[in-house]
Regions:
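Periplasmic/cell-envelope proteins involved in peptidoglycan metabolism and beta-lactam response
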Residues: 1-308, 330, 350-358, 407-417, ...
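Beta-lactam-recognizing serine transpeptidase/beta-lactamase-like catalytic domain environment
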Residues: 2-12, 84, 234-246, 284-336, ...
Length: 684
């Protein structure tokens, strides 16, 4: 059988190949056409529909906004004397990411051109852990003109190194104003997070510092101001070609205080070498006239970051100079509490102005053997309320306080703002402890029920300002001012005016009364007259009444730090200094329309009469010199303008804290069991 084979013809093969070629060519053409169509459509979209957007983007790559930080507002005293100011200087700064080669090599070169100290290097290394590598980190602040010139001549060979003009903050009176002015510091991550949370981050573009404490923190928004900016054009390399527009910043407002710095200087002089606090208030306005917490510190150390050595010296010093004793020191008020107890006894009807009761040398709760002793072993015989205040009888108040009880007497004491913040324009004021059964139950919740419950005997020491009582010197001055002003309550305040230089506007802090206590005028008159007798013969502060050229009311107070066992006598010489009694004195003057109310505490200062001369000295200076125009001396700055020359610590009469032996922790409360309660419960 023969096999038939198909034999293709050349013509047929060519036709097939040509047909396939045409199909492929058409497909390629269509594909290319489609691509060009897409490109054309995209081109039209970009050129026509997205033109404005890309034009704006191109401009943004070329045009930048550079923020301009506002100048921080100044703080001045009542006469315009500057207490916190600004001054310009050059700062040597490094951008680590732009350094060519090793950073240490660059620093070594800079050390040949400027006096870069070990402290400068320590601060720089600390900042490196807090700043990003592309941020400017200060290596040396406040270059001298010669240093700036030498470095400027070498900048071409030092990439990543800049000299920038900065505005620096300064506190010319140093430690005299540290605890109420506070200080500013560099903006931290915590600060930035808080600003972002409050949606205020945009206000701090270009700013490097923020208020950290005191008035600098409380009035941060007013002092800081609003930033401006420069709109500039840059080339492809980021260099500024020209400035297109400038919007100036709105500088911060100036704070004007109610205080005369001369009175503050006198208060600091009186407290020199002593631990404690002194605060004075104008009862007619609430304006703070003097504010001393001693020992103090140099706030200029904190502005650009305190070095570790100085921080350790301050933080570990046994005298605790960083504590603001005026608003955060908690102490039992001792017998300075008695005038306010007297108002409670009179207003409640427990006694009258003519009531006379025994005031023996010791008293016991009926049915018990424990004796509560008077400071005078022989007692005071029989006494009315006026005499009990004049001679400071303890047993008089023991008995009446116990009989009345804490729940009945507490509302009257609360009217004087004991156990509450006064509302002063400073951050972190402690509210103190005005005890109650509810307070004790909550505070000692981890103790057995029988120890948590209120014991009626606890009212006995509370009646004379001991026990769980714990108040700040500011609270005592505020209560004294309220009593002196017949129950008219003003909020204590440091700032009396805000000066806005941008708007040419002055805002007054209007001293309107917060409220008026619902107490009888006759009772105010009676208690104030009794306080005047404290300075007269027979009174506990009779020595400072000698030669007094104006009328004054006052009350001494001796606050126990440790309890004395039954049958034992108090012997200060046998006690460690930190266990000795605190000395208190409160006062107001003159009796008619008082102009000043004062509270003084000397830690471990002994009898209350030891604090009285300080109040007399401050009152004399205010009423006889300042108010009469007798002192025209111009206050002198404590240091020069650019160098920190003050010692680290001041006011304590001691050597630098780094040379002090660290001893026992700062004590404020006499009762070991109540100490921790006041510290935690009294804070905000």
């Amino acid at each position: 059988m023969k096999t038939l084979r198909h034999i293709s013809r050349p013509g047929n093969d060519n036709a097939s190949i040509q047909r396939d070629f045409r199909i492929r060519l058409l497909a390629a053409f269509l594909f290319i056409f489609l691509l060009f169509s897409i490109l054309a459509a995209r081109f039209v979209h970009l050129q026509i529909y997205k033109r404005d957007e890309f034009t704006a983007q191109a401009a943004s790559n070329r045009i930048s906004l550079i923020p301009t930080a506002p100048i921080r507002g100044e703080i001045v005293d009542a006469n315009g004397v500057v207490l916190a100011r600004n001054y310009p200087a050059y700062s040597l700064e490094i951008i680590p990411s732009q350094i060519k080669g090793k950073l240490d090599d660059t620093i070594a070169v800079l050390k040949t051109l400027a006096d870069i100290t070990e402290s400068d290097l320590n601060r720089f290394q600390k900042f490196r852990t807090e700043f990003r590598s592309y941020e400017k980190i200060p290596l040396k602040l406040k270059l001298t003109p010669d240093e700036a010139s030498r470095i400027a001549a070498r900048l071409y060979a030092l990439p990543g190194v800049e000299i920038n003009a900065r505005t620096f903050r300064e506190y010319p009176y140093g430690e005299l104003t540290a605890h109420f002015l506070g200080y500013i510091g560099r903006i931290s991550d915590k600060d930035q997070a808080k600003l972002a949370e409050e949606k205020l981050g945009s206000l701090y573009r270009g700013s490097t510092h923020i208020g950290k404490s005191g008035l600098e923190s409380f009035y941060e928004r007013q002092l800081h101001g609003l930033p401006g900016y420069r709109e500039v054009e840059k080339d492809a390399y980021g260099n500024i070609i020209r400035t297109l527009r400038t919007v100036p910043p709105q500088n911060g407002q100036t704070l004007k205080l109610a205080m005369d710095i001369r009175l503050q200087q006198e208060a600091v002089r009186l407290m020199r070498g002593k631990r404690g606090a002194m605060v004075a208030i104008n009862p007619q306005t609430g304006g703070v006239l003097a504010f001393v917490s001693n020992p103090s510190f140099n706030p200029n150390l904190f502005i650009d970051g305190i070095d570790s050595e100085n921080w350790k010296a301050l933080n570990e010093n046994w005298q605790k100079p960083l504590i603001n004793r005026v608003t955060q020191g908690l102490y039992p008020p001792g017998s300075t509490f008695k005038p306010f107890m007297a108002m409670a006894l009179l207003e409640s009807g427990k006694i009258t102005q003519s009531s006379v009761i025994p005031a023996p040398g010791a008293w016991s709760i009926p049915g018990t053997k424990h004796m509560f002793r008077d400071s005078v072993r022989s007692g005071h015989g029989s006494a009315n309320l006026s005499k009990a205040i004049q001679v400071s009888s303890d047993t008089f108040f023991y008995r009446l306080g116990f009989e009345m009880g804490i729940e009945k007497i507490r509302p009257y004491l609360a009217e004087f703002d004991f156990g509450q913040q006064t509302g002063i324009d400073l951050p972190n004021e402690y509210r103190g402890v005005l005890p109650s059964p509810e307070w004790k139950e909550k505070r000692f919740s981890k103790l057995p029920p029988e120890r948590r419950r209120w014991n009626t005997a606890e009212m006995v020491p509370i009646s004379i300002g001991q026990g769980y009582n714990a108040y700040t010197p500011l609270q005592m001055a505020h209560a004294t001012a309220t009593l002196a002003n017949n129950g008219v309550v003003y909020r204590p305040h440091l700032v009396k005016e805000l000066l806005d230089h941008n708007k040419q506007q002055i805002t007054l802090i209007d001293p309107k009364p917060q409220r008026i206590l619902p107490f009888k005028q006759s009772n105010f008159n009676y208690v104030k007259a009794a306080m005047a007798k404290v300075l007269q013969p027979g009174g506990t502060a009779r020595k400072i009444g000698v030669g007094l050229k104006y009328s004054m009311g006052g009350k001494t107070g001796t606050a126990q730090v440790v309890q004395i066992a039954q049958g034992k006598n108090y012997n200060a010489a046998a006690l460690a200094e930190q266990h000795r009694d605190h000395a208190w004195f409160i006062a107001f003057a003159p009796m008619e329309k008082p102009q000043i109310a004062i509270a003084v505490i000397l830690e471990n200062g002994g009898w209350g009469a030891n604090a009285a001369p300080l109040a007399r000295g401050l009152s004399d200076y205010y009423l006889l010199k300042l108010k009469s125009g007798g002192d025209h001396d111009i206050p002198v700055d404590n240091r020069n303008k650019t160098g920190v020359e003050n010692p680290l610590l001041a006011g304590s009469g001691t050597v630098r804290p780094s040379e002090n032996k660290i001893t026992e922790a700062f004590r404020t409360i006499h009762n070991p069991e109540a100490a921790h309660s006041a510290a935690s419960e009294a804070a905000p």
